[in-house]
């Protein structure tokens, strides 16, 4: 059994997960928490190479099953090379996306079989699930508007998808929230960043048993 604490950050495009994480890190450091932050797909060399293939805007012909299997391959390598060692070392590991993204994007978004995705996630992770998942919820239109207004953000293949896909993805997350409400906590990402950070901090500290 791992000795650390695994947190995943989830949400539709433009929910602001990365900005919240950047604001949280100094707070955690003051608390003396040993933290590893990482992302999917990516996090390690092989994973980052797979990420480039998945998100390349020119790869418009990518089949949905190909996309899913690339994510799963990246997940496995990332887990064994980076995440599991950090958990064994007793660290707090915060992942920008994990298993729920596959269900939301490839399951609900692409229409692939949810049971097959669950099996692949189980196969890739040996059954590992986050201790806590923070789901940053935002209306699809607002999230995409944020992306369009952020000139510093690199546009990827998923950003170019139609509104319908993104709506299905959000519905997927809301379905997961209903199914696994004991693990997944919904955070209103439409609020000002400072409020979102404070809410996230409170939920995280409560989940880890840290004093606020």
From Swiss-Prot:
- Do you know which InterPro entries this protein is assigned to? P-loop_NTPase, Thymidylate_kin-like_dom, Thymidylate_kin_CS, Thymidylate_kinase
Q: Where along this sequence does the record place binding of ATP?
A: 11-18
Listed under catalytic activity are: dTMP + ATP = dTDP + ADP
GO annotation, cellular component aspect: cytosol
Q: Which GO terms describe its molecular function?
A: ATP binding; dTMP kinase activity
Q: Which Pfam families match?
A: Thymidylate_kin
Alphabetically list the UniProt keywords.
ATP-binding, Kinase, Nucleotide biosynthesis, Nucleotide-binding, Transferase
EC assignment: the record states 2.7.4.9
Summarizing the function annotation, the protein's role is: Phosphorylation of dTMP to form dTDP in both de novo and salvage pathways of dTTP synthesis.
The record's HAMAP family line, in alphabetical order, gives: Thymidylate_kinase
Family designation: Belongs to the thymidylate kinase family.
The protein's name: Thymidylate kinase
Q: Which gene name belongs to this protein?
A: tmk
